[in-house]
Design a protein with these regions (language model features):
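Bacterial signal peptide processing site
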Residues: 19-21
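Surface-exposed, charged secondary-structure patches
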Residues: 66-113
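Short, well-ordered alpha-helical segments enriched in acidic and aromatic residues
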Residues: 42-56
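C-terminal motif of bacterial Sec signal peptides marking the signal peptidase cleavage site
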Residues: 14-17
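Bacterial N-terminal signal peptides that target proteins for export
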Residues: 1-7
């Protein structure tokens, strides 16, 4: 195969690869899923840090939020078994207002499932839970 024929084949693929962008819905949904996966893994501080706060919060208040996340997961574990899976079903985005709703399906160890809506806010290019 000649050199020009290879470039004729590779150039369109490079063009598609470089222009293919992830949708805002995918990004917001993936962020929400990641935050809830952190909660499921017991990474409570990371989960709490996933909430949008325009101002900093006192350390003792942050600790209370972490304790609340621990209590929430402990209660769910008692009632349904551990949080076994987090799946993104869909997300909607309002690009003008920089907000989104991510729809997550939570699966528990007792095989029960619950769909939740996670409201999101975009700040400086990152998605946070509201």
């Amino acid at each position: 195969m000649k050199k020009t024929n290879i470039w004729a084949l590779v150039a369109p693929l490079l063009l598609i690869a470089c222009t293919d962008r992830t949708s805002p819905e995918d990004v917001a949904g993936a962020a929400a899923k990641t935050y809830y996966q952190q909660l499921a893994k017991g990474q409570y501080a990371e989960y709490v840090d996933g909430f949008y706060r325009p101002d900093s919060i006192p350390t003792h208040y942050r600790q209370q939020l972490i304790e609340n996340a621990k209590m929430f997961l402990a209660e769910q574990t008692r009632e349904r078994g551990s949080l076994a899976g987090v799946h993104l079903t869909r997300a909607t985005v309002d690009t003008a207002l920089h907000t989104a709703n991510a729809f997550l399906l939570l699966t528990f160890a007792d095989s029960s499932r619950e769909e939740i809506v996670v409201p999101m806010a975009q700040h400086r290019g990152l998605w946070y839970m509201r």
